[in-house]
Amino acid sequence: MKNNAKEDYRTFSLTTNYSRQMIYRCVTGLQIGFSLFSFIIVCVALPIMYNHVQNTITYVDREMAYCEVRFLYFYCIKFFSTLQRSNDEAALELQYGKMRMTGNRTARGAYGSGASHGFRPTAYGDEITGAPLETECPGCCIPGPPGPRGSSGTPGKPGLPGNAGKPGMPGTTPNQTCPLNQVREPPPCRPCPKGPPGIKGWPGFPGDVGPPGPPGLKGIDGEDGAPGETGPTGPPGYRGGPGAPGDKGPTPEGDLKEGPPGDEGPPGPIGAPGMPGLPGRNGLTGGQGERGWPGVSGESGEPGYPGPEGPMGGQGPPGEPGVCVCQNVDSILLINPGPQPRIRADDYNSDDGYGGSRGGGDRAGYQGYGRK
């Protein structure tokens, strides 16, 4: 019975897993199909849209070009037709517009010859009056002279002050001497040595307890326990029904004599299964399995608070006195000379900012002291 139950459970689990796999396969296939369908639609729709937009742009460009060509052609025809008329008539049209002019065009108009030029003859001396109208060829009109100069505009606001300029170069006066009381900026001080480190701060507070590590791997299973005691024998099964009667055998001839008893017949078929027996006792508890591997260590705690600021370092050595270098004079004057600090020769020579680039270090820096 137990084996049958296990087999049924395995069959059910296999059937369930198979049905799940089929469902997952169907869902995956549908997703792939929709993705391919969308990709195909995009691949087909984008070229069609691009072709439609390109055709629209081309059509608009052609229409615009046609309109421009037609516009230019129209005004070119008007321009060439204007050139066929006389210069005076074109100038009058440009000045007063296309209108019927009255008056003498030239001196010959007084004798009646002006009628052949499109003017209505009038008395000699009449002036030509009329408001300027739209010319027949606005694209070819000659621009008039520039108008009078307009009035000056409102003065603008003053601009922002510019950036300060760089300091100029010092003057070059021959035989210039440096004044004794001239205030000059002292040379930059040498970098002082670092002070002693401060007192070590208090240790920070301990960090929070890290999260528990993940569970360790499963330990090795212990050995199987000893088999339990055999359960009691179940009750006998139900007795089977009687078999069908066999065919009658042939009647022997002659006198009947009883023969010896025959051999024992084969056992009958197995009867129906009996009632299940009582469950047996549980076996002995197996030994304890081996200890699992240790879990991963937790994260480190937060850093502690910073310690208090250390005390200020000691005062550095005093700086060197200022120097004044005069131009065109081979001497260096000391301003307010005082006690000179004792500096090692190697430290002084290694500094390029004092005497190192002026040829000679300490000896060259104080060579002209007290000499003019």
Curated annotation (Swiss-Prot):
Pfam families, A to Z: Col_cuticle_N
Database matches in InterPro entries: Col_cuticle_N
Keywords for this protein: Collagen, Cuticle, Disulfide bond, Repeat, Signal
Extent of Low complexity compositional bias: 197-208, 293-303
Residue span of region Disordered: 144-372
Segments of this protein annotated with the region Triple-helical region: 144-173, 195-251, 259-324
Name of the protein in question: Cuticle collagen dpy-10
Species annotation: Caenorhabditis elegans
Gene field: dpy-10
